[in-house]
Amino acid sequence: MLAMKDKPWLLLFGLLAALSCLASFGDAAYPYYGTKIGALTRLHHGVSGDVYAVDSRTIFIKKFNYDGEAPAAYFYVGNTARPSNEGAARLRDERGGTASLTRRYRNKDVTLSLPEGKTLRDIKWFSVWCDEFAVNFGDVSIPPNLDFPRPQKISALRGVHGVSSDNIVIVDAQTLLVPNFSYDGEAPDAKFWVGRGQRPTSDGLRIPDENGKENPLRRYERKTIVLTLPEDLTIFDIGHFGVWCEAFTVDFGHVRLPEGLNVPPSLKMLGISPQSKLNCEVLYDDLAFEVRWAVAGESIVVQLVAKLEPNHYMSFGISPNKNISQMIGADAVVAWVDPQTGNGFATDYFLEGKAQCSGGRGACPDTKISEKTNSIRLLNAAMVNGYSIVTYQRSLAATDRLDLPISITGAESVVWAIGPLNDYQEVSFHTFYNKHLHQIEFGRQPKWNCPLPEGARGNSNSSEQEDSAPAAQSSTGGAGYPPAGRPNVEPDEEFYENRAEALHRQPPQRRQETAIITQRRPVPTPKPVNSNGAWDIPAIQCHEPEDGVFYAQMGPTGGKHGYPAITGHVGWGISWYINGLLIPEIHVVRGKTYTFVVEGGNNPDIPAKYHPFYISDDPVGGYEHKREEEKKAVRIYAGVHRSRSGQVTPTGVGRLCNWTPDVEGPPADDYQSFGAYQRTLTLKCDAGEPGVITWKPDRNTPDTVYYHCFTHRYLGWKIHVHDSCDSEAGGLKGAASERHEIRLPAKATVAEPAPVHEDYAGEASVRHETKMASALLRLSRRAY
């Protein structure tokens, strides 16, 4: 459970931001810097600039100017009525330095942090102040009721495929914190998804996962993740966030984003490179072994990065002797990533000796020596371009007798090693280690002493800036070099939960173009799958059922023997069942009227349970999410109504009935025939009525059409249309369906036929009641 009362939580989880964010770091193209406080008064030495509140402890000055000629000028804040040095607090400059401002600033963007323990509520003014002459060079007043930006808590995710989370936090304008996220990982093409409006559509945009990847999502079980919106996209551009199956256009669960959220700008929007907020030191250059860290309150977040061989570990720890790097007695963390599963590990070790752990002696996990002594919390792990990256948290203080404290007031001697894991997934003797004294000041101002990740750039101020810090040069960086985890701006002491004062603010003015795609783009086609081992599903012949009534319901795809093997397309978990059969091929005759009783769901607010039935010449389905040029190429024969304005509305809509597998039974892959699998299914229906559509194929109907879902792709299969029903044309191979009695009301309501359009055939629809028993839809009489 995320401890929201912990003040440093924002920085802590900021380190988990997408690991590849630096690759796309660049100039921000939108003018949002937080809440504007005002302009600096122009008093002396050319001081000017616009001052913004980034969050409770951070000030941003846009286009700051100062001639640099005064002998002792500093940034100051105070709580007196007007600027003075009485009781005022001096700020570090934008580089973390404490020296006076002796260099010239010309239209430079400057970000400053308030002293520890102070917030904007505690001060009344900000000033450029000269100590030597006690002169105010320029200042701005801080309003007592200043509504500074802060993270905002919104709703939690709830959806299908096990999608869930705790309440999501909008950390800043480009960062989302999703606590305790879960997803079963069973869909083939699920992505994190954002877009305009309140509901997701295929017009939206995928966003990278917590490791910066856009691959289909794997299984998550209550994992807290941080996601970064790509490029210049911000929360002001989007109306929802969720999980979306891109190939099948299915919403697995989403939340709406309230308008006008008062959140901080991201680091990129302020032109700040992520590594400027992190510490980094190279431990072993040959394997690109680095340690990155940030102190967060009473704890420290550490990220280890190395190019490891399979089944190897990297370790980092504190020496028991402050004067030498001593392995024996050290408190270390051993970390690695399993390249097969992607799972990461970070284990608390006590190095009692050089031997492998045996009987609590040697290099042992703390828990092998004493129970409940693992003081390490794994936050994230990933494999990126062959680099193992593990992020963990531990307390600065020692929490048990096997731990050593980490000082933030001086240098600590550290130890590190790389080596193979043994059969017990514990350390074997190291292959590489530090042979000389290596000391680190963990409490220093952030300093990046590592090669810059590919694509990283410095502060993106105007070309007129002078005296900017030189960019770090990389000897080992380059293509594929691992990115840094990105912390957020200084931690806030609180966040909003969508209180009234946090909403209804005007979002920042944006340029006309945004990163959201405004035109429908092609939906990716799932890769073909192996059709070997497909179940034999009996076709529904043209002479059956005698009354021409088909019952269309939802059910499982049947694992590797079902939908994928039958059609050659990947399924996303559900398919149409016609008269109890999994996507059977249907044979019909021109000139005969057929009735489809549809029970695929009728609540469009839950897209994963809303499957309007329709018939067209399109083998894919999902008409609703096609681009306009794609729609023009599709002819629909049944299941829609077209209004005079041209709006196409599905009419094959009814309550949801679902063939449900036995959760205690074997998986579908274990069944050798559909008949055996079908006997384990139970039909479960929601309250309400089915929908009914009628269809009469004619001489203009192609020989092959398809039944599908109007809102999702790849849920149905083929309908073969014949001129007559004889043994050759109709494919008579034995009965596949039973007759089912239906009872229409005495005065059934018949909809007006849809206006005929060149791409749409008219059809009539009726609503009716059914007289179904629990075993209405039994499998055909054909023996299995």
Swiss-Prot record:
Q: Looking at the Swiss-Prot or TrEMBL record, what is one Pfam family this protein matches?
A: DM13
Q: Which residues form the DM13 domain?
A: 34-143, 151-258
The answer to whether the entry has keyword Nucleus is yes
Q: Where is the DOMON domain?
A: 287-419
Q: Which residues form the signal peptide?
A: 1-28
The entry's localization annotation reads: Cytoplasm, Cytoskeleton, Spindle; Nucleus, Nucleolus; Chromosome
Q: Which UniProt keywords apply?
A: Cell cycle, Cell division, Chromosome, Cytoplasm, Cytoskeleton, Meiosis, Microtubule, Mitosis, Nucleus, Repeat, Signal
InterPro entries attached to this UniProt entry: DM13_domain (IPR019545), DOH_DOMON (IPR045266), DOMON_domain (IPR005018), Spindle_Org/Thrombomodulin (IPR052126)
CDD domains found in the cross-reference section: DOMON_DOH (cd09631)
Identify the domain of life: Eukaryota
Q: Name one GO biological process term.
A: spindle assembly
Renumbered to this chain, region (Disordered) spans 451-491
- Chief place of localization: cytoplasm
One cellular component (GO) term of this entry: nucleolus
Q: How does it assemble?
A: Interacts with Chro and Mgtor as part of a macromolecular complex forming the spindle matrix. Chro colocalizes with Skeletor (Skel) on the chromosomes at interphase and on spindle during metaphase.
- UniProt cross-references to PANTHER family, sorted A to Z: PROTEIN SKELETOR, ISOFORMS D_E, SKELETOR-RELATED
The role this protein plays is: Provides structural support to stabilize and organize the microtubule spindle during mitosis (within embryonic somatic cells) and meiosis (within spermatocytes). The role in mitosis regulation depends on the Ran pathway.
Q: What is this protein called?
A: Protein Skeletor, isoforms B/C
Instruction: Write down the species.
Output: Drosophila melanogaster
Q: Highest lineage ranks of the organism?
A: Eukaryota, Metazoa, Ecdysozoa, Arthropoda, Hexapoda
